[in-house]
Structures are given as C-alpha cells and as structure tokens.
Swiss-Prot record:
It comes from Methanocaldococcus fervens (strain DSM 4213 / JCM 15782 / AG86) (Methanococcus fervens). One of its GO terms (molecular function) is ATP binding. It catalyses: tyramine + L-glutamate + ATP = gamma-L-glutamyltyramine + ADP + phosphate + H(+). Binds 2 magnesium or manganese ions per subunit. Residues 104-274 form the ATP-grasp domain. This is Tyramine--L-glutamate ligase. The lineage of its organism: Archaea, Methanobacteriati, Methanobacteriota, Methanomada group, Methanococci.
Amino acid sequence: MILFFEYAIASGFEDEGILEEGKMMFNTLLNQFLEIDNVTSLIHKDFADDYKDFENLKIVEIEDDKDIEIKLNDILKNEKIDYALTIAPEDENILYNLTKIIEKYPVKNLGCSSNAIKVAGDKYLTYLTIKDYVKTPKTFKPKKYVIKKIDGCGGKFNLFDENFLIQEFVEGESLSVSLIVGKKIYPLSLNRQYIDERGFVGGEVNIKHRLKDEIFNEAIKAVKCIDGLNGYVGVDVIVNDEIYIIEINPRITTTIYGLKTEPSLAELLIKNANNEELTFKVEGKEFTINK
C-alpha cells in the first residue's frame, strides 16, 4: 500500500494557481502509483468527488487543513503502509512537519528526509551550505533592510523584515535539473523554465543544451552538499557564461507534468527506496500552467 497526497488538494487551498500546480503533480503521480499498488490519499471534501471513480484508491476526506496531521498519523498507525510520499510547500515548515510524522513510522519515505528539508527549504541555509562548492548568487543574511531609490526624496522607502533575504540578480537562462537521489544521483532531465511576473508558468522538459553535462555536474555537486536528500529533487539554475545554482527543491516539482520516463517516475522512486540500480529512458514535453 502506498500513502500519497498533495497538500493543496488535501487542504482545500483556494489559490487557483497553486491548486492547478498541485493537481498537475498529484494526478501525474497518482496514476503511476495506481499501476503499481493500492493507494491511500488525503483529499479535501471539496475535491473528493473528482477521484471517487479511481480504482484501488482509498480516499480519506479532509474537512479542515488542521485535520491533515491527525489523519496522517491515524493512517500510518493503523494501516499497513509500505511507502509514503507527500507533496507540500516548504513554507511555514509544512513539508518538514509532514515528513517528521512519516519518519515516526516503519514505512519507506519516497521523499527527502526532514533534516534535508530543513536546510534546502531555507534559502539562506542552502546558500551557506553550497556556496563553497558551486557558484551561487551572492546572498545577504536575512534581517531588516530598507530599500530606497538612490535619488529618491520625500522619505519614501520599502522595509523588509527577517522573512526576506537580498540576493544578487544574475542575468541568464532560467533552467532546472530533475534528479533522483539515493545511493547514487541520477540526473533525469534538463528543463527550461517559463517565468514572468506571475512566477513559474510552465516549461519545456528534457531539452538539449550545449552545456548539459556541465549543468548536470554542477547540480550533482550542489545536491551532494545536503545530507538526506532523497527521491525526486529539483535544482534551479541560471546559465550565462557560467552556471549558477539558485535553489534546491527537496520535493516533487511541477516539472514532472512534462516528464515521461520508462519505467515511470513512480516506479523509479520505489526502486530507489529499495536501493536498486536505476536504468531508464526519458522523454519530455512542453507544458503551461493556468494562473
């Protein structure tokens, strides 16, 4: 039995853009997991009807997002779960806390460890951890900053608190690397990211690039800096004449919507959890997100 859920769908998240990305990731992996085994999933009552006709899927309905941790504990305590995977944001330690719950039980976590999430989920800790090993934009310690125009007048300024950090802007191509991390690190694909004023709005998966091997190598070097990364990991990079590591995402990313592997990504995650050698073929496609 596989326990698999996505936080936006489980919590009834109201932001349509976030929910759209959540559904893209959840539906992609859910269908793959169902080809392997029975699946139990936490799904908010507003979305449960969308999945009621799925065979071999047990739905645990959520009334309120405060119930998620309680229901997660109940399932792991009372059902025979072999593997568990949650897709959730790092914000407010959501992914960290859910992973800590999974780690209390004798199941195989298909995702990253809570210790790795603690580091990779914090942009400044990530910077401190990788800056001596890979090129990354100069980043200043989070504290209160005032930002104002050089020639401004009238006392106008913006004040940012300790929840923000200031980072050097690097011009270049916005790319990402999808990897599976275990006893070995397997690059799956190099991807182009579509980013505008709305944020991440899509991409092109498994692209060709003259620096592909070098980008893979830099991503692997960065991943090796953080203990406990496991399963699917996404690394954001900026490429110009050099390769800059921007962020390490210790979780499933929306890029998997455009990623097709043989065997499936779900099967690769399970093989990885069992310390098996991975061999695979990769195809990719372009996708967009409605925001």
